[in-house]
Amino acid sequence: MLGGYDLEMQEIERLLINHNCSYSNASLNWQNAHLSQYAHEISALSKSDTNIYGIELFEDITPPPNYIRIDHHNDFSDRPTSLIQVAELLNIELNRYQQLIAANDVGYIPAMMSLGASTEEISAIRLADRQAQGVTDNDEELAIKSINNLEQCNDLIIVKALTPKFSPICDRLFPYKALLIYTDQELTYYGDLVPKLKQLFEEHINSHKIYYGGNDSYLGIAKKAFSPNEIINIISQIKLLYENV
């Protein structure tokens, strides 16, 4: 059962097709990638001897005993990327392109650079990832307009996004030391203070309002988990860490 769609999930689906594996794709995004979206499939297989694999699905319902979670976020952040986990289950080796997809998913551009990726390879992977996430030409244009109004707080760049798609903003601003992108409904921070922010917002992480991943390279809030004023308050707390540097 596939979770929210991006380049990694797209490649996982391709692997499953190429190896004749049965799977379900509810065409989910990161906001609605919940286990309950597959309640019908789970009900049909819960009492069988077949293992049910859920890939990056938030467990908003209790999974059956034969359910196995594949993930590398939050409490599963010490595990390999989901693409690597699926490849291991299928007993196959990833090719160069797939290795770059996995690196991109867990560590963004720096992780691809650590594999010796060329500028052309990085650009191709990032473009493919944005397209898989549903980024449109209009989103790309709005990203440029958003960047034109960025705010700088020492090493922290703050951008209020005019689009819900943050990736075209990230890609255009890279490299950066720390980046915070937000709207009235959500927020994502990219930088090396994630461990400190995990401590600061531990209560919200435990209540699944805040998530993190990418080897502690990013931290975000679930869409509509906080009011606009609460988001501004969270931004203020993060800014304070940089103002005191």
Predicted segment positions?
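Long, hydrophobic/aromatic-enriched structural stretches that serve as scaffold segments
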Residues: S46-P80
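Short alpha-helices
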Residues: I70-A128
